[in-house]
Amino acid sequence: TKIGDKPWIAKFQKRGDSFPECRVELATMRLASECGLDVPPLDFRCVLDRDIYLIERFDRIPHGNWLERRPFASGLTMLGAHESEVSSFSYADLAGAIRQFGTKVLQDLHELFRRMLLNILVTNDDDHLRNHGFLFDG
């Protein structure tokens, strides 16, 4: 979706959902930002009594009437893994991919470590290779 001239990802509350997933995810991302992690701009709306959690797209660059796609690959792709193998990979494997493919290795390793700590502290049960990614910035 678009807000102003920028593209955003919208996550909607499920009908009949008693757990406020959108609000929890927003609060967790704001906590991540307060902890110094690299977090895109966030927003929250409530429309017709349904929560909408918004994240500004970090993988698109607006150019007038069109959007340039920033090259992106998930941790799963960067490790050459298959969905059925995700449980056999770890943060150490992601760190290895950063060392192998990264251009800001020390900065990105620090970011990965801080993300790992936050995920542990908030008991993130959705921490998997698809939720870690690499952006080409060259």
PLM regions and their residue ranges:
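Conserved kinase catalytic-core segment
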Residues: 19-31, 90-138
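Conserved ATP-binding subdomain of kinase catalytic cores across diverse folds
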Residues: 1-88
